[in-house]
Amino acid sequence: MHRYKKEASNLIKLATPVLIASVAQTGMGFVDTIMAGGVSAIDMAAVSIAASIWLPSILFGVGLLMALVPVVAQLNGAGRQHKIPFEVHQGLILALLVSVPIIAVLFQTQFIIRFMDVEEAMATKTVGYMHAVIFAVPAYLLFQALRSFTDGMSLTKPAMVIGFIGLLLNIPLNWIFVYGKFGAPELGGVGCGVATAIVYWIMLLLLLFYIVTSKRLAHVKVFETFHKPQPKELIRLFRLGFPVAAALFFEVTLFAVVALLVAPLGSTVVAAHQVALNFSSLVFMFPMSIGAAVSIRVGHKLGEQDTKGAAIAANVGLMTGLATACITALLTVLFREQIALLYTENQVVVALAMQLLLFAAIYQCMDAVQVVAAGSLRGYKDMTAIFHRTFISYWVLGLPTGYILGMTNWLTEQPLGAKGFWLGFIIGLSAAALMLGQRLYWLQKQSDDVQLHLAAK
């Protein structure tokens, strides 16, 4: 019992800064929306559309670089800190290489917008925002590579502090470039992209400064010697991170596809769906931060050759995540009207949003289990299992079921509309929770040699 209590304490210490850093990240998007909305509805819509293209693209790169966290955590746990600089340098090189195709995709935004049938003024602003935010791509991914290093060393506070500095800088920079202050051009929504690019370069430099000057990282000597690109290691990191990157990409695009499918149901339904989805994404930060912390703890314990400790870390993470989700789900049910009223005063939208928030409460519990189980499996470097199971859950089970229930009368007398899609979310996430949980259980039942061999790849 003592080990469980100690592990819970370690987990919370790691997860709390990750949670706060996520809040800061979300806050930057919120500031962009508010500032652009202060110019016009077109500017706000343009920023929103641009974000729907930017986010899946950049998260693919982030997913690739998340592979570095368990690699560093295991080397640190094993006492082989001398090998960490090589891995970090390969991660930084991978970040630069991945930036190229992501920039190429984002640079073609005008062709993507053409398929979306967006009005000309909005399309022009969307493309302008994207061409500005393109400059943030290498900084964002290099920052993620360095953050994977510090997180892997169980130092999650630096990214938290720098994330909040980024948020504080984002506000005045948005004000300057959106509204044209201090001699800067008045760029409207495009100015949000300029501010974002500047902020991420500053955040990268701040994290680099911390790593170079930190006494807690001095023994690693991460930049004492430059390690040249090693194709074999770059391919290994890419193969390790690709399943996570693909899983993240498919998860984000799933919600984007559902938003498009819900659109023909009318503005009231779309608004209610967005209320429930936006609130759920905010609550998701809790289990997501626990999943990130579990990945670090499991990787560290496996580096120490402590498979029992890794299992305890995973199990404590699952219990903590589920307990947190049960609390947030209960609060969602009890205060669903007040939550809906935070977003809108339209009573028709509020009434439907209240119904969808009941589905969101169930969704939160399933989501917590699957994201923490996935975090545990990342610690074991069992990345491919995550991809296969989440792809089947979301795209083979969740989305088709949601479409059948929401848009057809094949299983019900009348199409259920948005409720059908939320039932699809619940079915998909429940399947993911069961399959990822089963995989984790199976892995923990294997011999120490099998577990350590998998973690060593």
Swiss-Prot record:
Superkingdom to which the source organism belongs: Bacteria
Q: Which GO terms describe its cellular component?
A: membrane; plasma membrane
Q: Name one GO molecular function term.
A: antiporter activity
Q: How does it sit in the membrane?
A: Multi-pass membrane protein
Q: What intrachain disulfides are recorded?
A: none
Query: What Pfam families does the database record attribute to this sequence?
Result: MatE (PF01554)
Which keywords accompany this UniProt record? Antibiotic resistance, Antiport, Cell inner membrane, Cell membrane, Ion transport, Membrane, Sodium, Sodium transport, Transmembrane, Transmembrane helix, Transport
Entry's Gene Ontology BP terms:
response to antibiotic; sodium ion transport
Q: Where does the chain cross the membrane?
A: 30-50, 53-73, 93-113, 126-146, 159-179, 192-212, 242-262, 276-296, 315-335, 348-368, 391-411, 416-436
Q: Where in the cell is it found?
A: Cell inner membrane
The record's annotation in InterPro entries points to:
MATE_fam, MATE_MdtK, MdtK-like
Protein family per UniProt: Belongs to the multi antimicrobial extrusion (MATE) (TC 2.A.66.1) family.
Q: Report the protein's function.
A: Multidrug efflux pump that functions as a Na(+)/drug antiporter. Confers resistance to norfloxacin, ciprofloxacin, ofloxacin, daunomycin, doxorubicin, streptomycin, kanamycin, ethidium bromide and acriflavine.
Record's protein name: Multidrug resistance protein NorM
